[in-house]
Amino acid sequence: MPIRVPDELPAVNFLREENVFVMTTSRASGQEIRPLKVLILNLMPKKIETENQFLRLLSNSPLQVDIQLLRIDSRESRNTPAEHLNNFYCNFEDIQEQNFDGLIVTGAPLGLVEFNDVAYWPQIKQVLEWSKDHVTSTLFVCWAVQAALNILYGIPKQTRTDKLSGVYEHHILHPHALLTRGFDDSFLAPHSRYADFPAALIRDYTDLEILAETEEGDAYLFASKDKRIAFVTGHPEYDAQTLAQEYFRDVEAGLGPEVPYNYFPHNDPQNTPRASWRSHGNLLFTNWLNYYVYQITPYDLRHMNPTLD
């Protein structure tokens, strides 16, 4: 789906240089079809970088996707220009009366912060409660998975003693599931988290279906049977260099991080890493858009059916 974004958004030129199809609002207005409305709640500090990563994955299907960027943290950003936020982001009050086909909630570097200490925790709870009646399907990524499991299922925060960082092998558990359609039997995806997601925890305390897990038995991809919510505990949106940037940042901060697993050639941080997960990431987001959003959402969003009966 060509993503439909404002003409002036920096991601337009960035993604076009990568041969990614981006449709600006001015061009899209000439096509007489209803685009899918997808809201992205961007919780990452480097918002422009995160926009590029997610928009890249939303760009590869034949229908238009109308992107709306949402922020819920009113504090001044140290990593994103205020002008960019003012021009391209909306506040929750701006969209709370609207309905959306899809919602993506990104990760956030909050793995060691207790939920109640997160500055915008009440706002996250508000958005998730709102989404039950206003969004067809929501996709949670990394830290957002942990937050959603707590809010929706009451599961306490599970934290690892060491950070999981690297590119890990996964295997699918339900090859005929719509969200894993076309996946290889085993595939690679990046992780960068303190959050812990043992598959047994998901099975014991939720009715969610685990669709793929790591070789160590951690849940990677799981979803509700009605397709209203889906969870991915890794970072399939990451660029080739993202884990390297995080690693060298932590080295400079004196944190003594472990070298990301299965990432640098020959395990040497001086070597340039290569992305080995792009096809997986693209297929995951295409499947979500098609089977969890497009095939289910009503043509007229005014007639949203929250229960999907």
UniProtKB/Swiss-Prot annotation:
It catalyses: L-homoserine + succinyl-CoA = O-succinyl-L-homoserine + CoA. The record marks 192 as: Important for substrate specificity. The keyword Transferase applies. Substrate binds at residues 163, 192, 249. The active site is at residues 142, 235, 237. The record marks 111 as: Important for acyl-CoA specificity. Transfers a succinyl group from succinyl-CoA to L-homoserine, forming succinyl-L-homoserine. InterPro entries: Class_I_gatase-like (IPR029062), HST_MetA (IPR005697), MetA_family (IPR033752). Its EC number is 2.3.1.46. Belongs to the MetA family. The keyword Nucleotide-binding does not apply. This is Homoserine O-succinyltransferase. Keywords: Acyltransferase, Amino-acid biosynthesis, Cytoplasm, Methionine biosynthesis, Transferase. It comes from Escherichia coli O139:H28 (strain E24377A / ETEC). One of its GO terms (molecular function) is homoserine O-succinyltransferase activity.
